């Protein structure tokens, strides 16, 4: 019998993120940065604003990592024949597939995540830093988190730079500024990664596609026979639908509408 309960990987990742976030913030306050100078001069507006942004980014991170990303639930089959409007919403050209892992009927754009062991609607990817999937329900919050986190990282980068002192003997510099310089390098790396992630996700959202669809379109049944994205309604409408709330309608319906528009243009 185990003396300790098994460690939850999600709890470890979230605890590590929280400790790292407040640890970096503490370093910026303890060293001779603009943040500390503002505090000593009694100018508390900017330090409090920075702390509020850090706290907001942390709460948003926890919200995205803990919320349901859009798991596909088992729904009972309706009694008798389906209603006419329900049948029209799922055309025969786009049959629903049963997941061979969890045995649920997968809506269009859903995928089974082996890490979460669940099917996720409009699956984008499984984020190891969140220890959660990014899907239909939490993808907008995920992009908002990336934007806010980038602001915090860039501001923290400027604050760390303001406290670096280069004109000192090597030994003295290492003792007084070594930890701050390490923090500066960490912030630089994280800012670059988050900026690239934010840019790529905004690009994909503007095209109404997901990371999984973008990378694996040649293997996805509803995309490999097409020359264009059946869900793309133009950048403005795609962004509006994404940030103003899901769902914008069953994806099967949008796919069918795209086919009808294409056939009418040919005629």
UniProtKB/Swiss-Prot annotation:
Gene: Zdhhc12
Pfam families from the UniProt entry: DHHC
EC number: 2.3.1.225
Protein name in the entry: Palmitoyltransferase ZDHHC12
Major location (coarse): Golgi
Keyword Chaperone (UniProt): no
InterPro entries: Palmitoyltrfase_DHHC, PFA4/ZDH16/20/ERF2-like
Organism per entry: Mus musculus
Similarity comment: family membership: Belongs to the DHHC palmitoyltransferase family.
Record-annotated active site: 127
Membrane topology: Multi-pass membrane protein
Location within or outside the cell: Golgi apparatus membrane; Endoplasmic reticulum membrane
Chain segments annotated as transmembrane: 10-30, 44-64, 141-161, 179-199
